[in-house]
A protein has these predicted regions:
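Hydrophobic membrane-targeting signal helices
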Residues: 7, 42, 93, 112, ...
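Alpha-helical transmembrane segments in multi-pass integral membrane proteins
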Residues: 9-18, 65-67, 91-102, 123-255, ...
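Generic alpha-helical transmembrane segments of integral inner-membrane proteins
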Residues: 32, 36-40, 86, 90, ...
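Alpha-helical transmembrane segments
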Residues: 33, 104-111, 158-161
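Surface-exposed cleft-lining segments at the edges of enzyme active sites
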Residues: 71-76, 121-127
Length: 288
């Protein structure tokens, strides 16, 4: 929900080329570093073998279309983000991105129809029906933050919340082994809590100071997310027998946090961000 808020914000007053450049540089360079890190760790620890073709295919996030599996399963969320990027890019291309009331209402109706009637069946071709409520909510929260309260934003956010609760209840099977009603209810409550938190942040009821520590912690979450699963778990499994599970988990967590900070501080902040600023500045200079 937070990333979608930022994506919608980044679409404002930008051309298609500027938006595509911004999103590409935000998503891919760090992904490449983290793919290499995961390959390095799992090759050494688990003695896994990856072909160069599989690694390069994962660099694109289109690896499944090329017949290659994910090196790390967490990449599935990035593929959902790519679809969202594409939708926003199309809206910018046609100059209708600011007509939120029209396309957001259509999207919400289609999502509700798919939730209750599994129609239209083609919806999954261009956007995930299962995660559309979260995408819609993030845009609703952005409008709430930018334009203030309105009946439209309240309807969008509340409707998205209801659909998200239904989806959380249904999708608990994907994350929990044989979940009962209690586990499904907890999943729905966690989802509702994130909605309340986003409401509090966008309405100004909770204010976070723009200090470097908060910026750094927030920025570290992306690389940390990309390396924590396969690489992190493989290290814990490999060395927990020698040092104890708890001790190994703590050490690996600290290593992952440190590496994530290094990626943010020296790669993203030091190289990628200046490159993005320069390229977008050049695109604007040439009216692209």
């Amino acid at each position: 929900m937070i990333s979608g808020f930022v994506i919608t914000l980044s679409a404002q007053d930008r051309s298609p080329a500027q938006f595509a450049t911004s999103r590409f540089l935000r998503l891919y360079p760090t992904l490449w570093i983290c793919v290499i890190f995961t390959v390095f760790v799992t090759s050494g620890v688990l003695e896994k073998n990856y072909s160069l073709s599989q690694i390069l295919a994962n660099f694109t996030l289109l690896n499944e279309y090329m017949g290659f599996s994910d090196i790390d399963g967490v990449y599935w969320t990035l593929k959902q983000e790519l679809k969202f990027y594409f939708i926003i890019l199309i809206l910018i291309l046609f100059g209708v991105v600011e007509r939120y009331r029209i396309w957001l209402s259509i999207w919400l109706v289609l999502t509700a129809a798919h939730t209750f009637f599994n129609q239209p069946t083609f919806m999954g071709w261009f956007i995930s029906p299962g995660y559309s409520p979260y995408f819609i909510a993030r845009i609703g929260f952005y409008l709430f933050y930018r334009d203030g309260q309105s009946k439209f934003t309240h309807v969008i956010i509340f409707s998205s919340l209801l659909l998200s609760i239904i989806k959380a209840y249904e999708q608990a099977n994907s994350f929990i082994v044989n979940p009962g009603d209690l586990e499904k209810t907890i999943a729905a409550l966690i989802t509702s809590t994130f909605f309340l938190l986003m409401y509090a942040l966008t309405s100004g009821k909770i204010k976070i100071n723009n200090k470097n520590i908060y910026v750094s912690l927030g920025a570290m979450t992306y690389p940390l997310y990309l390396i924590h699963s396969v690489a992190g778990k493989s290290l814990i499994e490999k060395y927990s027998g020698d040092f104890g599970y708890t001790e190994t988990a703590i050490i690996v967590t600290l290593i992952m946090l440190a590496f994530s900070w290094l990626i943010y501080q020296y790669f993203e902040k030091g190289l990628v961000t200046p490159a993005k600023v320069f390229i977008i500045k050049q695109l604007r200079a040439y009216n692209l």
